[in-house]
A protein has these predicted regions:
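Catalytic cores of TIM-barrel enzymes
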Residues: 1-179
């Protein structure tokens, strides 16, 4: 940034796409399965080749990677809307669901707590001021932290609601250096 400029933390995700939320009952699981199946031969050829390119066009529902992560139902329905929208595009890899709940869950293992600014992704205030402080800290198991439990329960919710018919990724894996 140039001298005097301020980071615009209130700007939304430039990759976010406006989508219409879709309930599990209204989502076309058959169409998605057919789309995903139609890509497998190309993926197999890519994996067996010495070189090549696969095109991945992620349709990210606006808000899911911000404040919409707090409401599992809303996040899932927005992501289902994004999956449905993604079927309109030629790609080599099908889109998937992501039970995203911020990138601060590793910080949560060290006692960090999420802070939600209006309309923004969850944040964690800096906790360590040196590498020595970080190395001396004793982390908690992720399943024993509020953010960790939220992610695990949200993943289970996504799997239950879709009956395991859609791919669900791990949440966004981050480094403890983010603390």
């Amino acid at each position: 940034m140039k001298n005097g400029e301020v980071f615009q933390y209130d700007k939304r995700d430039s990759q976010g796409t406006h989508v219409t939320p879709v309930s599990c009952e209204a989502f076309d699981f058959v169409r998605y399965a057919e789309y995903e199946e139609s890509l497998k031969e190309r993926q197999k050829e890519f994996l067996e080749a010495d070189e090549g390119i696969l095109v991945y066009r992620r349709v990210r529902a606006d808000g899911v990677f911000y404040d919409k992560c707090r409401d599992w139902k809303e996040s899932l329905e927005l992501q289902l809307g994004a999956l449905q929208k993604s079927l309109e595009y030629q790609a080599d890899i099908a889109n998937f669901l992501e039970p995203w709940y911020g990138i601060g869950y590793i910080a949560g293992c060290f006692g960090g707590e999420y802070e939600f600014l209006d309309g923004q992704a969850p944040a964690v205030r800096p906790m360590f001021h040196s590498t020595e402080e970080l190395l001396a800290a004793a982390p908690e198991k992720i399943e024993n932290t509020p953010a960790g439990r939220q992610i695990l329960e949200m993943t289970e919710y996504f799997m239950d609601r879709t009956k395991g018919k859609l791919p669900v990724s791990l949440t966004d894996v981050q480094s403890p250096i983010n603390m």
